[in-house]
Amino acid sequence: MPHYRDEATEAAEEEHDELRGSALSHRPIDPRARRINIASAVLGINKSFYVALPPGYSSAANSRQRYPTLYLFRGHEREWVHRQQDHSRHGKTVIDVYRELLEEGQVGPMILVFPGTSSDSNRVPGLLVNFRQPALIRREPGIGTGQFEDYFVRELVPYIDNHFRTIPHRRARGVDGFSLGGFQSIKIAAQHPELFCSAGSFDGTFLWATNQGKGVRVRDRVLNNPMFDPVFGTPRDLEHVAANSPANLIATGGRSPLADVQWLIRSGPEKAEPWQSNYYRAQHVIGLLGARNIENGVEAVEPEAIHNWHWADRHIATTLPLHWQAMEQAVREDFTGVIEHTSTRMASA
């Protein structure tokens, strides 16, 4: 079984979670999210993530039930479950969004996972990329070897499937993210469409693909930000950038596997560019999907949105029912024993 911190152990029973959710409402981290620390052989360090289990998960009546999983990315593992991540949230988290949708019947029970893909300080992003020059930040806690793609695919996803009652199949697994988290969710789904059936992004900080996806736009303030030096190298290893950029992966990947993923890419409006919206970057990626005759399955622009956590949570309120619809058939088939579980093969990959 996974090793929880003390406060998570206290909340092991779902009913107890609800009581604590009221009693500890003043704490910044949503107490319904459990922090788990695992020893990563890939990163060579201990790495944390949060998980939110559905109501009734611990009850005897549901002991044989398995659940679909949605991974939510930003950078630090706490961001999606931090009530005060910015002032726009007004004390709520994405778990409140999920619970409201569940009560309304717009989604079914699912497991939410919040991976940590940055340094402990959140100053160095990991981007779900295997770092080109990890030695540049050797002393930054939380990075280790910097092999974040391998950590997620080879360790974290199998860990979740082996320690929780998931439906360990791509048809019951999705990803979503905000800002750099949107880069990560679309990147990992385009790179590994065999693992995910649904991928969303709100205001993703995407890079620009050139030359039919073989190159990247070099004059880009995002690409040239020094915080990406360990990830992409200095000077930039443009081949490494292209191999890990969502836009390039969509432009050059196999059409059939990409078309088998539900894409849910959204952004703020053009009027909020350049500092409060990534409208142009999102439109670039959506356009590349369209060039492959692959549909973006959601309204692409939130007309009044800006780049903050209130709108990130609103994005999940829009996309979570669509993620659920993509996974619902797999949930039914798992209940009847039709779907084949694949976690063992993933864990040994």
Protein language model regions, located:
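Non-catalytic cap/lid and distal C-terminal segments of serine-dependent acyl enzymes
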Residues: 2-349
